[in-house]
Swiss-Prot record:
Membrane-side (Cytoplasmic) residue stretches: 1, 114-123, 170-266
Protein name: pH-response regulator protein palI/RIM9
Membrane topology: Multi-pass membrane protein
This protein's record includes keyword Membrane: yes
Chief place of localization: membrane
Organism in which the protein naturally occurs: Eremothecium gossypii (strain ATCC 10895 / CBS 109.51 / FGSC 9923 / NRRL Y-1056) (Yeast)
Keywords on record: Cell membrane, Membrane, Transmembrane, Transmembrane helix
Residues on Extracellular side: 23-92, 145-148
Any single Pfam family the record assigns to this protein: SUR7
């Protein structure tokens, strides 16, 4: 559970949480939030879903993108001008902000669920792949904000760059965690092999079990017969071993000496 998380797991969860928070600042800007803006210029405050007039506190309806005719919606207003010479059609790309936020929410949920349950290579691989998609969307958000509002880009726009860096950092942490799990699994398998070696090592050294027969694989009836026959063949002496040369045996009593001729066994 989350109470026993390691430092690496805390870093992964913390980086994704901060990235989600920073993206929320930029997405929920004016007119959703009057105090948070992507840019302010010439009496206007710009956000993802519209803009507001700071003088008369008027805001456009919620929509994606800006239009030059928006300034004439209120009496006494001039034509709306963007901080840069970018075309108004480029402001339609602000749609990547809510898309990136949704991807970030999904990434954050996957990280939280991975902390609550046992880690697996599959879950971490999905997190790594999804974080790459989230990073591309977050970086695109920052580029759109730069093209539209630089040099009047406010701090929520710059937080998108920080969020992109945090997504890369969290992806690196997930890669490190996945590599650690793989190494632990390999070490565990090697340890189990060492523990099983006293059980099967003697049989392998005596030639009872061939190299092709893994000790982890259960024996079939045919393999048992094969192993038994090979074991019996090694236990029975060969014909050459049965042949014993003639030996001269000397009795313990030095006064009696006899030569006993031992004939070879047939």
């Amino acid at each position: 559970m989350m109470g026993g998380m390691s430092v690496v797991e805390w870093l992964l969860l913390g980086s994704t949480t901060l990235a989600l928070l920073f993206q929320s600042f930029a997405t929920f800007s004016v007119p959703l939030s009057n105090g948070v803006t992507l840019s302010h210029f010439n009496g206007y405050k710009f956000g993802v879903f519209g803009w507001c007039d700071t003088t008369h506190t008027h805001c456009t309806p919620l929509k994606l993108g800006y239009s030059a005719e928006d300034g004439f919606l209120f009496a006494g207003q001039d034509e709306l001008s963007l901080p840069t010479q970018a075309k108004y059609s480029l402001s339609k790309l602000l749609v990547v902000h809510p898309l990136a936020l949704c991807s970030m929410v999904v990434l954050w949920l996957m990280v939280v669920l991975s902390q609550c349950y046992k880690h697996s290579d599959r879950r971490l691989t999905i997190i790594i792949l999804w974080s790459f998609l989230t990073y591309m969307e977050t970086l695109l958000c920052f580029l759109v904000d730069v093209l539209l509002f630089v040099p009047y880009l406010d701090w929520p726009g710059w937080l998108m760059l920080v969020s992109a860096v945090l997504v890369v950092f969290s992806s690196s942490i997930a890669c490190l965690r996945r590599r650690t799990l793989t190494s632990q699994r390999i070490e565990k398998g090697a340890k189990e092999d060492l523990e099983l070696y006293p059980l099967y090592g003697g049989a392998l050294g005596a030639g009872v079990v061939s190299d092709s027969e893994s000790p982890h694989r259960p024996y079939t009836e045919g393999s048992i017969i094969s192993v038994t026959s090979r074991a019996s063949s090694r236990l029975l002496p060969s014909a050459s071993e049965l042949e014993t040369p003639r030996e001269e045996l000397t009795l313990m009593d030095p006064s009696i000496k006899c030569h006993i001729e031992r004939s070879p066994m047939s």
